[in-house]
């Protein structure tokens, strides 16, 4: 059985979605093109799509992705493409009705190695506002936007958006005394694929 048929998961990288990946994956539809505009270290990639695009502005993340996924590009029946461009350019370039975007922008400013600025001087809230109000309404493909807990400002803003919302909590893992949770926001209804 090849990795594509077995829906092989690759879970690694920053703590963001690492613990939640297996709970998020059932909501991700199989698509011809799978894109992560903020890939980080590629912690939630599921190898069941025809083409996978992992994008990040961080030099550290890009070098890691090239080392980690180079072997899969050669051994899988489908390409893993690694790009280093602004997330808006990445979304525009790969957008089609056959594309699925897993969009996981930084939740906080202080998570980057050596204070590396991965995008610009914008705050994470400004990125979410830009995505929800200007970019995602025009996307042809399907998408899921991942957000930190609801008690933070970003989670509150996303929960009030016009899009479908779903909160997933990890059943056992706790962080700062609370269950690890992520809010998902999408342009389509949430259903397990």
Briefly describe each language-model feature range.
Residues 1-193:
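Class I S-adenosyl-L-methionine-dependent methyltransferase catalytic core
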